[in-house]
């Protein structure tokens, strides 16, 4: 990996960019953050990189590839660089398909519902209780799916699971971390969501945030209160 050129990354904070940085750290890939403010994402210079005007995006000079959408970036990084399958699985195996399934569920379930709940709690110009209630119900539903699934997964002797796929921590698990940590700063128990109601999910998250690559990324963008 030492011969690789640094991958350029636009976006560092927020719920989605850390997902990419976590994978880069887990794989030991060189990368550099490109300075950009949220006020600049709709400007022509950045729209030429990501026409959707959102963060993150990457440019990999090793393959001359520009890519946006965090889930697509995660898939690319593990398919291209995780040849030892440290956090992924061999192509054409059931585990590889199941990992993709959970990544897509994160992108279609956790991301949109958690995002809308946070929007209506913190950013919407006026309170809309029915909207907040709807999205928090969906947060509870999605968390229940993950919690119930983890509860049924066997842990082999000496294992550190349970995990979503293949008895190891993979990109399918790691993709969920940053939104869950963002949520802690915005949604409170009185809003109707408490991670303590999902003990298997909470334990799973605790195990992931204890990993050194995850700690490094989160400490940079979500420092603990002093």
From Swiss-Prot:
Pfam families annotated for this entry? GST_C (PF00043), GST_N (PF02798)
**In what residue span(s) does the GST N-terminal domain sit?**
4-85
Q: Which InterPro entries match?
A: Glutathione-S-Trfase_C-like, Glutathione-S-Trfase_C_sf, Glutathione_S-Trfase, Glutathione_S-Trfase_N, GST_C, Thioredoxin-like_sf
- TM ranges are none
Domain (GST C-terminal): residue spans on this chain: 92-226
Q: In which pathway does it act?
A: Secondary metabolite biosynthesis
Q: Which GO terms describe its molecular function?
A: transferase activity
Going by the UniProt record, its keywords in alphabetical order are: Transferase
Q: Which family does it belong to?
A: Belongs to the GST superfamily.
This chain belongs to the protein called Glutathione S-transferase-like protein gedE
Q: What is the source species?
A: Aspergillus terreus (strain NIH 2624 / FGSC A1156)
